Design a protein with these regions (language model features):
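Membrane-interfacial helix-loop segments of redox and metal-homeostasis proteins
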Residues: 1-101
């Protein structure tokens, strides 16, 4: 893994670690924010609020371990793909939320 790739994995891993920790610590606040934005159907708010944090933490740990050279390349790439998909979903969510304002 190149230095730039490792640094990127570590940086994204740290962002996901912070975000995931906050979402796990306060799923009610996450659910309330989802409700306030009004983008997703109400029945999905609770499940998403409970799942988002753990998913972010798993991706964070895999990226941090991969960036530090403690994880094989394939699982690190899978985690990177998961982070990209999460980022794309978040971007789409933000665009929809902005359209509502």
């Amino acid at each position: 893994m190149s230095l730039l790739t490792a640094a990127t994995a570590l940086a994204v891993g740290l962002v996901l670690l912070a975000s995931g920790a906050e979402h796990v610590r306060s799923p009610r606040a996450t659910r309330d924010a989802l409700r306030a934005h009004g983008v997703l159907p109400v029945p999905t708010h609770r499940a998403l609020a409970l799942l988002l944090g753990p998913v972010e933490l798993v991706l964070a740990l895999a990226l941090l371990a991969g960036g530090a050279g403690l994880l094989a390349p394939l699982p690190t790439r899978v985690a990177a793909l998961g982070a990209v998909l999460l980022c794309l979903g978040f971007t789409a969510y933000l665009l929809l939320a902005l359209r509502r304002t």
